[in-house]
């Protein structure tokens, strides 16, 4: 069998960064007791998803995205296309993810153990309640949506969406500093969050690192959903040049109206 070069596409590269984030979370934990190593389910995806942000940054692509034969760096034009494509179809993708997370909750909050029509339940959950359209086959159907019954994510698929809020806000700390490789912030992320495992509530750890509650704006910007707030009314005022005013001679308004009628 002829040997061939094994390459990674962009999605596989993001997955590599994602799983490396999980690995770092495990390697950096410095808790005294093994029982304090685990974190809440809706916090576990933060370390992995935040790593994905670096995968497509031009500064990072210059370091690893090299042509496998010539070793040439990726052209800047291609880097920009990759960046712009990140917002493609994000509205529908987010709708699908939210529908999947909510339908996961639907099936795990049933108050009856009696058998029921799964297909009818699915149609209600995805189409009637969540607004998906039947012309597009749903990505997450119950028969093969393994997260809802296998792998520890039952009633927890929302972890991924909540982690997007956290990871985009956490990455904003690096981005807004002007250096996505800011060592000071990276050390704080490791010391205040990654290394502490589950010794405190996840949001306590997050606030300790970020100094604030997570903000949804970075996620909305990343997806292309953000709309700049309307300026205050005073800022819309335009200063017009002075106009010479001529006073109209006093007259009886009824007389003026009558004259206007006569001209018609």
Regions found by a protein language model. Name each.
Residues 262-264:
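A positional/structural detector of protein chain ends, strongest at the extreme C-terminus
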């Amino acid at each position: 069998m002829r040997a061939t070069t094994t390459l990674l596409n962009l999605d596989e590269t993001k997955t590599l960064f994602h799983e490396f984030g999980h690995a770092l979370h495990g390697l950096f934990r410095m808790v005294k007791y093994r029982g304090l190593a685990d974190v809440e389910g809706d916090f576990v995806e933060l370390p992995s998803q935040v790593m994905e942000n670096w995968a497509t940054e031009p500064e990072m692509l210059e370091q690893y995205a090299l042509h496998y034969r010539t070793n040439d760096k990726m052209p800047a034009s291609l880097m920009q296309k990759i960046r712009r494509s990140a917002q493609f179809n994000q509205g529908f993708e987010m709708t699908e993810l939210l529908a999947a997370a909510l339908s996961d909750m639907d099936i795990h909050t049933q108050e009856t153990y009696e058998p029921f029509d799964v297909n009818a339940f699915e149609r209600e959950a995805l189409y009637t309640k969540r607004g998906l359209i039947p012309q597009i086959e749903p990505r997450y159907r119950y028969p093969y949506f393994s997260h809802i019954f296998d792998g520890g994510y039952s009633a927890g698929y929302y972890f991924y969406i909540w982690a997007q809020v956290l990871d985009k806000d956490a990455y904003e700390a690096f981005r807004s500093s002007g250096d996505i490789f800011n060592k000071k912030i990276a050390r704080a992320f490791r010391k205040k969050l990654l290394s502490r495992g589950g010794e405190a509530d996840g949001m306590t750890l997050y606030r300790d690192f970020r100094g604030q509650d997570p903000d949804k704006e970075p996620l909305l910007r990343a997806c292309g959903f953000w709309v700049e707030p309307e300026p205050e009314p005073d800022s819309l005022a335009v200063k017009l040049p002075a106009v010479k005013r001529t006073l109209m001679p006093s007259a009886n308004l009824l007389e003026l109206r009558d004259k206007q009628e006569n001209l018609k």
